[in-house]
Amino acid sequence: MYKQIIKNQSVKGNQSHQGVLNSAIVNQLLIYIRQGSGNTYYQASDLDDCNLLVVLRRATGEELTLVSADLLSLANYSNYSGGYSYDAAGTDKGFNILLNFGKVVIGANDQLVVTLTTATGATIDSSPVVSVYGVTTDFENDDIFRYLFYNVNGSMLFKKVVSIFSDSSPNGAEFLIQHGNTQETVLDHCADAFSDLTGKYEANSTFYMLFLDQTSIGQDVTVITPASKRILAICR
């Protein structure tokens, strides 16, 4: 469901990060910036210094530019979705931007070339790390994922969930998910690191990204919390 394009590349100064994807059907791109330790961090206003270029190169030689814009405009544009996480002081600690394409079919000999140009000013000492993933699906009838923000207090049913995001640590009974007659902690659906994107979460940030495993993809999932939690879900 998630195809790695650019993975955990450190941002130092002005830098260009590039990755290629082929043999996939892409509905969305997920751009994730994780802040490292430090005293100053990327703020939303810094995203206008980061630019994304997405080009589809067909085997025939045809090239089609799908996206060419700075990240701040993408995060704020109405046809896109963006989310931020914060530390206790309210400082932005991580960014995720989800770009909706509809459906882009990339053949085995085609290339989706993603170039993310980042800028880190002298005042930013958090050593940010960037990743870009293709959100892929074999769903028919042009089903489109949706990006939804909820404050969950108690429980809430998400229809056909494939991924859940939260700014709260997914540990123990603080965070439960139920699908069918099965109720488990989030950790039962996560592994120990954010690597191959099937049942993983980002453990080095205040922002957690849960990608449900294959047994739950496309199922109705109930998220259960003992207190109000900010939940972001991708559903179809």
PLM region descriptions:
Residues 1-236:
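Beta-strand-centric surfaces of beta-sandwich/beta-rich domains
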